Amino acid sequence: MAVSVLEQGNGPQAVLIAGPTASGKSALAMALAERLTGTVLNADSMQVYGDLRVLTARPTVAEAARVPHGLYGHVDADTDYSVGRWLADATAALAAAREQGLLPIFVGGTGLYFRALTQGLAEIPPVPETVRREVRGTAEGLDSLALHARLADMDPQSAARLQPNDRQRVLRALEVITATGRSLSDWQKDAPRPVLDASRCVRLVLEVDRAVLRQRIDARFEAMMAEGALEEVRALAARRLDPSRTVLKAHGAPALTRHLAGEMTLDDAIAEGQSDTRRYAKRQETFFRHQMADWPRATPEAALDALLGMIRPHAR
């Protein structure tokens, strides 16, 4: 029988569940939502898009029917969707959950979303499309180390806190310094009061043994292929979107697109998609280790009990 934590009194503002891809976050969030009358809210930057349900591992129709879900698949692929837009949507979803008496359970692997929720997000002026194209056009001829060196010349403050292989964030910092003449780090210091008070939230990072996670990633990619991932990518490619659109960078999508164009075999595309996903998981773990060091950790097997144990003191 489900129990409403919010009806019992001073429950947590929200539950925040982070972890690398394929770590079992979604299943954990659904189990918790069933136990505590919650709603599962997406905190993954690829699962916001409606076009790649299978390839981005969004909840299935059956899973979504088990408990309320929000912030999944609500964005068209031909859309620029920023952290700021997600935060605005998340704020509205929080208000709706509270009105309905549901415990908000944010789950995902995008660390920047969790940071925006609990630390605030600076109101950085939008980057003009001309600047974006200029920066990304220049970047096409540079490897990650050279691109990072370019950022270090223009914005050493941001370069010092970004890894060279975090190419998207390096590009973002270059766009901001080029468009505004001000470091992204300086803009971020002006962040307003956050939507959530971290001390009043129950937070958890899932930790999975590296070898086990590798096996789970590879097996899940194979399962995605069996469930129609290639057909999803074929339909997306038929839309002929601007190559800079974020959804086209979903893990596995570039390799499968090249396969459809006759540039590589299906086996090679699958292997590349698996390898790309494993590299992404490592980057996620690095972010969690450095940027979310004060969050409690738990294995997938112990996570539900750990969360329930942390929630009880809030509900007294």
UniProtKB/Swiss-Prot annotation:
Entry-linked InterPro entries: Dimethylallyltransferase, IPT, P-loop_NTPase
Region feature (Interaction with substrate tRNA): 44-47, 168-172
Membrane-spanning parts: none
Binding-site residues for substrate, renumbered to this chain: T21, A22, S23, G24, K25, S26
Named cofactor requirement(s): Mg(2+)
Enzyme Commission (EC) number: 2.5.1.75
Protein residues bound to ATP: G19, P20, T21, A22, S23, G24, K25, S26
GO function term, MF aspect, one: ATP binding
A Pfam family that the UniProt record links to this protein: IPPT
Residues at the site labelled Interaction with substrate tRNA: T110, R132
Reactions catalysed, as given in the entry: adenosine(37) in tRNA + dimethylallyl diphosphate = N(6)-dimethylallyladenosine(37) in tRNA + diphosphate
Keywords, comma-separated and alphabetical: ATP-binding, Magnesium, Nucleotide-binding, Transferase, tRNA processing
GO biological process: tRNA modification
Biological role: Catalyzes the transfer of a dimethylallyl group onto the adenine at position 37 in tRNAs that read codons beginning with uridine, leading to the formation of N6-(dimethylallyl)adenosine (i(6)A).
Record family assignment: Belongs to the IPP transferase family.
Self-association state and partner proteins as the record states: Monomer.
Protein name stated in the entry: tRNA dimethylallyltransferase
Name of the coding gene: miaA
